[in-house]
């Protein structure tokens, strides 16, 4: 059967969504004329719309009747890149010809998906972005790219927003701190962000912007107030939509975060990015590291009892990544930008 319209469903967090987007570029390489739609939650949709290898974005919240949506569409292939029984049942009822889902330990995908794949995420040594490529096997695509290949599969067209550009314009190097993770991963200690920002006061060219939700901004005000009071720091927590945050990250000069959605956005956009990770198997950079042409991940191998505590905010292996290590990379970034400006100025 000739495939003409694929829908990829990923309705969880923004980081997971970003790590699924390389599939769209790889499918386009093999089937250039194919239409690719992407179904995600409304809050993640603005970032997916900036991806040029996605032809249409459907917001999960807009589907009051998923079965009717599938029946009325021309979608002939659906990839459930995340377990979702409601959508799997709907595609089955609508008789979508090709329904791909992971049937490993999942009875409803055995029943409702007629092109099942079988793999485990938790026990795998592969990166999350690589695991997603296993969904392409029923399409005849068995290649799983090396990590070094994936950054080239990100294609974004992110607009400039004049108000945001104006905020950044007075400073030569705009560095984003995204200290919190919305409870989705281990965090670098907030006092380390304070130490790093305090040390960067000595670099007049660098200005720090703290991003996050309004609730995260409130947490920082209560637990890391010194960070928000430093003269080289501006707090924009709760002031940006996700679409604006994407524009802000793209227009800045670098970002530092733990394994959270904005980290993966920054890396995918090609921004200078530092990801800070624990060593626990389910959270380490081999599984969730930042993937981008200017991204790098830091992690320290230590005997960390805190890694075994499921919902710990931080742990000893995160504390073993020092502010001095991170600052060294930031200063290298600053030198790189200065050199680039000198080269373009003399050209």
Locations of regions flagged by a protein language model:
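Catalytic machinery of carbohydrate-active enzymes
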Residues: 1-347
């Amino acid at each position: 059967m000739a495939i003409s319209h694929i829908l990829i469903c990923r309705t969880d967090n923004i980081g997971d969504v970003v790590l699924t987007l390389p599939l769209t570029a790889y499918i386009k390489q093999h089937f250039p004329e194919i239409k690719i739609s992407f179904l995600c939650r409304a809050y993640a949709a603005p970032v997916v719309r900036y991806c040029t290898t996605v032809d249409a974005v459907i917001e999960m919240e807009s589907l009051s009747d998923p079965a009717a949506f599938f029946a009325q569409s021309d979608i002939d292939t659906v990839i459930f890149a995340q377990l979702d029984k409601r959508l799997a049942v709907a595609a089955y009822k609508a008789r979508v010809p090709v329904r791909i889902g992971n049937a490993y330990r999942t009875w409803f995908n055995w029943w409702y998906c007629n092109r099942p794949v079988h793999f485990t995420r938790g026990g795998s040594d592969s990166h999350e972005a690589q695991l997603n490529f296993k969904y392409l096997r029923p399409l005849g695509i068995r290649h799983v790219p090396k990590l070094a290949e994936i950054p080239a599969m990100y294609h974004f067209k992110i607009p400039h927003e004049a108000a945001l550009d104006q905020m950044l314009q007075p400073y030569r190097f705009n560095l984003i701190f995204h200290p919190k993770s919305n409870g989705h991963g281990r965090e670098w200690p907030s006092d380390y962000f304070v130490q790093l920002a305090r040390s960067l006061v000595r670099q007049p060219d660098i200005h720090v912007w703290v991003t996050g939700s309004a609730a995260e901004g409130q947490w920082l005000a209560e637990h890391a107030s010194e960070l928000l009071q430093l003269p080289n720091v501006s707090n924009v927590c709760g002031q940006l939509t996700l679409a604006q945050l994407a524009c802000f990250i793209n227009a800045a000069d670098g970002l530092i975060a733990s394994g959270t959605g904005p980290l993966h956005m920054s890396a995918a956009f090609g921004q200078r990015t530092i990801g800070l990770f624990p060593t626990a198997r389910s959270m380490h950079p081999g599984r969730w590291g930042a993937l981008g042409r200017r991204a790098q991940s830091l992690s320290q191998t230590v005997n960390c009892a805190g890694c075994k505590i499921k919902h710990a905010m931080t742990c000893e292996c995160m504390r073993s990544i020092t502010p001095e290590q991170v600052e060294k990379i930031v200063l290298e970034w600053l030198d790189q930008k200065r050199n680039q400006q000198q080269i373009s100025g003399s050209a």
